[in-house]
Amino acid sequence: SSAASDVYKRQLLMMKSITLPDRWSMFFKQLIKEIYKLGVDSLWIVIIISVFIGTVIAIQISLNISSPLIPKFTIGYTTREIILLEFSSSIMALILAGKVGSNIASEIGTMRVTEQIDAMEIMGVNSANFLILPKMLGLMIFIPVLVIFSMFTGIMGGIFASYSTSTGMTPSSFEYGLQFYFNEFYIWYSIIKSVVYAFIISSIAAYFGYNVKGGALEVGKASTNAVVMSSIMILLADVILTHLMLT
């Protein structure tokens, strides 16, 4: 019953957050701040991880298909498919759940335990709307940018690996593989998935932060729970969205 009441409380919190802001000027100021803090500040980690993973994927695939029967361009083709379909959206979302989710949960949780949220409620401000909506929208607006950067840098990492001689890849066959049977829907599929993930990360983290009771220790527990819970929900959403959109 606790899980059901959790879901119910989260629905109530979402309904309270997703309303028109009282003061638009304030809302846009917050939105820009959150886009910068949650989105732009995550660019560097997305780029670093994507380059390395793209390189590793290309090297591992080239070692796995060292059979003379398999054409070399499959390395580029498979690297592209893995990065476009799964890595840039789902694996990135898991990494962002750790970075962004814990940030949101601890920030809102700290405001709760220092009684700032109670002060807002007394002043007649819709605290959920004021605190949560800019974070949710900010992440949902900027996550496609992160995904596109991740795809680009991941594939650049693969190209970088194809220039190394020991792997048996040639840049020309790798680049032919990158263009082979390209389906642009996969990029849209990843972007749509990532927006859903952004909603999951921000709403779950906000819920755990908003409902903290206690002190600093509970804030830490809440951000841990937020990361664990949103990771599970991301993987569940991944399965559901893949079934709906690709089969």
Residue ranges of model-derived segments:
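Start (N-cap) of specific transmembrane helices in multi-pass transporter permeases
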Residues: N126-V147, A222, A226
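Hydrophobic alpha-helical transmembrane segments of integral membrane proteins
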Residues: N129-L137, V227-T247
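Membrane-interface helix starts
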Residues: D22-I48
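Short, small-residue-biased leader/transition segments that mark boundaries at the very start
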Residues: S1-Y8
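Loop-to-helix entry region at the N-terminal start of transmembrane alpha-helices
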Residues: D41, I45, I49, I70-I104, ...
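Membrane-interfacial helix-loop-helix connectors in multipass membrane proteins
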Residues: Q60-L84, F152-V195, S203-A222, L244-T247
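Short cytoplasmic-facing helical segments at TM-TM junctions of multi-pass membrane proteins
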Residues: I108-L133, A216-V219
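Hydrophobic alpha-helical transmembrane segments of multi-pass membrane transport/permease proteins
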Residues: L43-I61, I240
